[in-house]
Amino acid sequence: MKSASIPIYLQQAIMNTLRQKLQQANLYLNRDFPEPTINYRQRGTTAGSAYIKNWEIRLNPVLLIENQQAFIDEVVPHELAHLLVYRYFGKVPPHGKQWRWMMEEVLNVPANRTHKFKIDSVRSQTFTYYCNCQQHELTLRRHNKILRGESHYICQKCGEKLIAKSIDSLNPNLYPMDFKMHRGGKGVNPREHR
């Protein structure tokens, strides 16, 4: 990840939104939730994360600088809602009805589960794998786990194990790599199985 220095005006805007939304929630819910810590150490393509045990919100500095207003308006309330939901309802699904209610009714922000930011600047090297129905791009970390025989991944759509294949027509001696690992698991995206 590229390192990014967050300008003071942007840090202040983040804190202003955080404090305003927290005050809004405290008034609506008749509570006195403490102010979470904000740090700028989120990595990869994730815009932000809420750490419940630390009462902390981590923001991706590169994506923040590239998408300033969207972070202020959407990402900060999104992550704050996760913290508030946990304190108010206990352990519930991360983007379930309680989270949607907190976003829309309490914080007055659309309950979008994912961001739509361009991620070219934070995208890491990927490796192409295939199943019976589509192509998948796996991260270097997942690719290396497969090579070491520690994991394999299953397509959630067709249920088949992902296999690295060479589509290099210049080298007909390259065959699909198939690792001798058992099949298993289900999910929506390619998932790790041990």
Swiss-Prot record:
- The signal peptide, as residue positions, is none
GO biological processes = response to stress
Q: Could you tell me which Pfam families the record lists for this protein?
A: SprT-like, Zn_ribbon_SprT
Q: Which UniProt keywords apply?
A: Cytoplasm, Metal-binding, Zinc
Please state the protein's primary subcellular location: cytoplasm
Which residues lie in coiled coils? none
What would be an example GO MF term here?
zinc ion binding
Query: SprT-like domain location, by residue?
Result: 20-163
Q: For this UniProt entry, what's an example GO CC term? A: cytoplasm
Transmembrane stretches, by residue range? none
Subcellular location, record wording = Cytoplasm
Catalytic residues per the record? 79
Keyword Protease, does the record have it? no
**Which cofactor is essential here?**
Zn(2+)
Q: What's the record's note on cofactor binding?
A: Binds 1 zinc ion.
Chain sites annotated for binding Zn(2+): 78, 82
Q: Which InterPro entries match?
A: SprT-like_domain (IPR006640), SprT_Zn_ribbon (IPR035240), Uncharacterised_SprT (IPR023483)
Question: Hey, which family's this protein in?
Answer: Belongs to the SprT family.
This chain belongs to the protein called Protein SprT
Which gene is annotated as encoding this protein in its UniProt record? Answer: sprT
